[in-house]
Amino acid sequence: MEKSTMSVILFVLHLLVLHLQYSEVHSLANTSAHDFSYLKFVYNATDTSLEGSYDYIVIGGGTSGCPLAATLSEKYKVLLLERGTIATEYPNTLTADGFAYNLQQQDDGKTPVERFVSEDGIDNVRARILGGTTIINAGVYARANISFYSQTGIEWDLDLVNKTYEWVEDAIVVKPNNQSWQSVIGEGFLEAGILPDNGFSLDHEAGTRLTGSTFDNNGTRHAADELLNKGDPNNLLVAVQASVEKILFSSNTSNLSAIGVIYTDSDGNSHQAFVRGNGEVIVSAGTIGTPQLLLLSGVGPESYLSSLNITVVQPNPYVGQFLYNNPRNFINNFPPNPIEASVVTVLGIRSDYYQVSLSSLPFSTPPFSLFPTTSYPLPNSTFAHIVSQVPGPLSHGSVTLNSSSDVRIAPNIKFNYYSNSTDLANCVSGMKKLGDLLRTKALEPYKARDVLGIDGFNYLGVPLPENQTDDASFETFCLDNVASYWHYHGGSLVGKVLDDSFRVMGIKALRVVDASTFPYEPNSHPQGFYLMLGRYVGLQILQERSIRLEAIHNIQESM
């Protein structure tokens, strides 16, 4: 048997073993207050004492950046730079009830939610706070699809992956109560044929299940910032309201290396920080922020950067390309009687679509980006928001600069939703399944009128097409009613911008660790994977340095 074939077989067997380990859910976090113990080593970027030399500088205190910085600080001096502020200044970020409020709050340039409209004309948001997206999202937690790892171009230590998930889950993940509306929607998914019933599980598997949540059963949010508590307070410094303007590079172009960063504080003053020998700059600024910073620093398409008068440090045609966002299509139903508000805890998973629902109280101000545009009609009573997500997707766009010098000016974003016909076909399948869902006995009590089919429901916005065989009507529905799922990824892909250790190709001491690294979602709700990724890469870096130091020691001993 050929060596390559044997390697594939061994890898698949390893995946199966890991899958069995996944199935045994270990103890998760307990209900508790959000743990802000780490604030003792958080500083405002105006503090000039932060300027200096570090072993590692991590740019972006978000989903991957927080666990990465905490892990590296176990052995080395680390500076974590975050453009936003801390959650204590915005207490609504810390509760499940505050999820919609955070999207409603006007963007003043400092609030946790930064608004933007993509060039597709669709409303979107991104995080601007320590903890990143984990502070503003819907709290859904799951592990990656077990097949995802073999598609990434990375050689994973799957035992370490499993232990790293547990490290995250022990701190910030709970088993949620099966809230009344979530229980109803779960019964509906099963009755509509999204089988089997997988009970409670963190695994991404076909079927219906109750999954983990970063909201505990008191409604308190837990998030990536709490993982900073696992860092060494003697080694870890966190600077908030620090906008990194540019990565600094060595003057030796034949041995190009990242040596530090320039960042600006909230007063507009500029600061510098540097990395020591064998240290690294690691960019974890997210799918939008990371390619933007690379481009501003001179890493990207040569002719494009030159046209903006940006000095080209390392040409790479793929920086900012292959940008993805999963389309979200939905229906909104008004039940005849009020339903309690709930966040997403039940998932319906198929290979060609993922389905969830949340229930909401009425509001007079629309949560920005929950609906495709601000002109969408407003609910006057409690309603159910029932969603179908397209996996992948295959359609992709790009990040381009809106300013060649100011990182605080948001870049231009285009996702090209449904430009790939497979994505559109998957949307049609998903929306037809929502039609099946509406026809179930589980949802019968939520009709406003006792008539057959789906006409008995009161809809907010566009109703679902009645004729399940009319693909053209469903395609039109998908195209005309697409919204953002906020699951941005790509822009700095492994194999195109990064090597298989997440190093930027052609540059020493520079890595990227965040959602910009892969061209597809690891699962239906990716925050679990990217929390794991930060810790995982941190451990890999510590292991690399340990091996290097041991080799140097052995050489010295032999002399």
UniProtKB/Swiss-Prot annotation:
According to its UniProt record, which cofactors does this protein need? Answer: FAD
Q: Which residues of the sequence carry a binding annotation for substrate?
A: Y485
Q: What is its EC number?
A: 4.1.2.10
Tell me the Pfam families matching this sequence.
GMC_oxred_C, GMC_oxred_N
Source organism (scientific name): Prunus dulcis (Almond)
Signal peptide annotation: 1-27
Q: Which InterPro entries match?
A: FAD/NAD-bd_sf, Flavin_amine_oxidase, GMC_Oxidoreductase-Related, GMC_OxRdtase, GMC_OxRdtase_N, GMC_OxRtase_C
Q: Which reaction does it catalyse?
A: (R)-mandelonitrile = benzaldehyde + hydrogen cyanide
Any coiled-coil ranges, and where?
none
Q: What class of enzyme is it?
A: lyase
Q: Where does FAD bind?
A: T63, S64, E82, R83, T133, N137, A138, G139, V140, V244, W486, H487, P526, Q527
Q: Which family does it belong to?
A: Belongs to the GMC oxidoreductase family.
Q: Fetch the PROSITE patterns from UniProt.
A: GMC_OXRED_1, GMC_OXRED_2
Keywords of this protein's UniProt record, alphabetized? Answer: Disulfide bond, FAD, Flavoprotein, Glycoprotein, Lyase, Signal
Q: Which gene encodes it?
A: MDL1
Using the UniProt annotation, give the residues that carry a glycan (glycosylation sites). Answer: N30, N44, N145, N162, N178, N218, N252, N255, N309, N380, N402, N420, N467
So which domain of life are we looking at?
Eukaryota
Note the subunit structure. Answer: Monomer.
Its annotated function is as follows: Involved in cyanogenesis, the release of HCN from injured tissues. Catalyzes the stereospecific addition of HCN to a variety of aldehydes in vitro. It is a major seed constituent, and could have the additional role of a storage form for reduced nitrogen.
| Protein name as it appears in the record | (R)-mandelonitrile lyase 1
**Disulfide bond annotation, renumbered to this chain:** C427-C478
- GO terms assigned for molecular function: flavin adenine dinucleotide binding; mandelonitrile lyase activity; oxidoreductase activity, acting on CH-OH group of donors
Which residues are annotated as active site? Answer: H487, H525
